[in-house]
Amino acid sequence: MTRTILSSSSSLSPQQAGSPVIVALDYADARQALAFADRVAPSQCRLKIGKEMFTQAGPALVRDLQQRGFEVFLDLKFHDIPNTVAKAVSAAAELGVWMVNVHASGGERMMAAAREALVPFGADAPVLIAVTVLTSMNDEDLRGIGIAGSASDHAVRLAILAQACGLDGVVCSAWEAARLKTDCGAGFALVTPGIRPTGSDAGDQRRVMTPLQAQQVGVDYMVIGRPITQAADPAATLAAILQELQPGGADV
């Protein structure tokens, strides 16, 4: 299967290919994750598998979701020496995931190695993005680990570095999106956690926006977890979010 690759040189917005919503499968076990997948449609969202779920269920869960027609974002945030990260990214590509990420703080050589590892996969390579500043972190948190300046400024620096290394986009807070679109261009994908539909609890995310607000500032892919996975009717919740994101949808 050929997956969409977002190039920093592309003039097309990544939102033009598929749903902009990525649902975080933050469940206790694979059975619950698959039960959720059976309640929604692949056309409504992509699905994100993080460290907890992948450690517990492994590649089998990815394949089970793919068999149901879903594109999978493997959110393992690889951060290691360049050779190790290159091999990990290559393994993710072999698994057929739609998107995979690395930590931008791993540096230029690490990100470049990850990019090079995907060249043999051609059009079947996953979208490769970098994590800038975790949305759970604020300026004070960064000062605690020796990074001066604001979380926003640091995220922008890391995003520019990731683009220079040939990555397709970054994970960032919605608060940096408008600035990043200006600095990196419309074709550089912005993937944003900390998105909460109106009326939802902010949870453990400190910097949050609603889906419509995020879209308006340039976010391409919105990661949403509990407001969808814990909804009484996840498909209806997704449908409402997607409707809101349509032109004039907020007025319906």
From Swiss-Prot:
Query: What Gene3D superfamilies has UniProt attached to this entry?
Result: Aldolase class I (3.20.20.70)
Matching PROSITE patterns: OMPDECASE
Where substrate binds, per the record, is at: 26, 48, 75-84, 135, 196, 205, 225-226
Reaction(s) catalysed by this chain, per the record, are: orotidine 5'-phosphate + H(+) = UMP + CO2
Which InterPro entries does this entry report, sorted A to Z?
Answer: Aldolase_TIM, OMPdecase, OMPdecase_AS, OMPdecase_bac, OMPdeCOase_dom, RibuloseP-bd_barrel
UniProt pathway: Pyrimidine metabolism; UMP biosynthesis via de novo pathway; UMP from orotate: step 2/2
Report the GO molecular function annotations: orotidine-5'-phosphate decarboxylase activity
Q: Which UniProt keywords apply?
A: Decarboxylase, Lyase, Pyrimidine biosynthesis
Q: Can the keyword Signal be found in this entry's annotation? A: no
SMART domains found in the cross-reference section: OMPdecase
EC number(s) reported in the record: 4.1.1.23
Q: Name one GO cellular component term.
A: cytosol
Question: Which family does the entry's similarity section mention?
Answer: Belongs to the OMP decarboxylase family. Type 1 subfamily.
Q: Which proteins does it associate with, and in what oligomeric form?
A: Homodimer.
Which protein are we looking at?
Orotidine 5'-phosphate decarboxylase
Q: Which organism is it from?
A: Sodalis glossinidius (strain morsitans)
What does the record give as the organism's lineage?
Bacteria, Pseudomonadati, Pseudomonadota, Gammaproteobacteria, Enterobacterales
